[in-house]
UniProtKB/Swiss-Prot annotation:
Localisation per UniProt entry: Secreted
Originating species: Oncorhynchus mykiss (Rainbow trout)
Keyword set, alphabetical order: Amidation, Cleavage on pair of basic residues, Hormone, Secreted, Signal
Molecular function, one GO term: hormone activity
Biological role stated in the UniProt entry: Urotensin is found in the teleost caudal neurosecretory system. It has a suggested role in osmoregulation and as a corticotropin-releasing factor. The non-hormonal portion of this precursor may be a urotensin binding protein, urophysin.
Pfam families: CRF
Main localization (coarse): secreted
Family note: Belongs to the sauvagine/corticotropin-releasing factor/urotensin I family.
Protein name: UI
GO cellular component terms listed in the entry, alphabetical order: extracellular region
Signal peptide: 1-18
Length: 165
């Protein structure tokens, strides 16, 4: 390959691989909404930008807070509308704004911490889509490796039987 096309190909790949995904997102989604209102999910996604992990953590914390009305009383009234990407500063601010659980824990609410830990655990559901494809591929490779080991062991037994006679 000549150097000029190689340099152009390399420059194209490097330039296109460093475009942030937020450049491709629309700025205003109101034109797609018939009522002129943005849904809270769209607003959160726009604010989250490229930080999907912080969005997922924030979503889990929000679900946990919505399930426990006692904890909602200690939050500011505008809290559900102030959903922003939670980085280390955001999680620290949220942790400081929540009242300590040990002070307010009643005997019937002893499982709330366990429920929160359970929310953060990964599901045991089978993987979907591309994860399932790679999972099946790994299983097939493992089965092929085991089969080849069995065949090799059988050949080794035959060789030992021949040499032993």
């Amino acid at each position: 390959m000549k150097p000029v096309p190689l340099i152009l190909l390399l420059a194209t790949v490097l330039l296109s691989s460093h475009i942030p995904p937020s450049v491709c997102r629309p700025r205003d989604l109101a034109m797609f909404d018939g009522h002129g209102y943005k849904s809270q999910l769209d607003e959160v996604l726009l604010k989250a930008g490229d930080n999907a992990i912080s969005y997922l953590i924030g979503e889990k914390i929000l679900r946990y807070l919505q399930r426990n009305p006692r904890l909602q009383a200690g939050l500011p009234p505008q809290f559900p509308f102030e959903v922003t990407p939670l980085g280390s500063r955001g999680l620290g601010h949220l942790a400081r704004s929540l009242p300590p659980l040990e002070e307010q824990r009643a005997p019937e609410e002893g499982n709330s911490l366990e429920e929160f830990v359970e929310l953060t655990k990964r599901n045991d559901d089978p993987p979907i889509s591309i994860d399932l494809t790679f999972h099946l591929l790994r299983n097939m490779i493992e089965m092929a490796r085991i089969e080849s080991q069995k065949e090799q062991a059988e050949l080794n037994r035959k060789y030992l039987d021949e040499v032993g006679k």
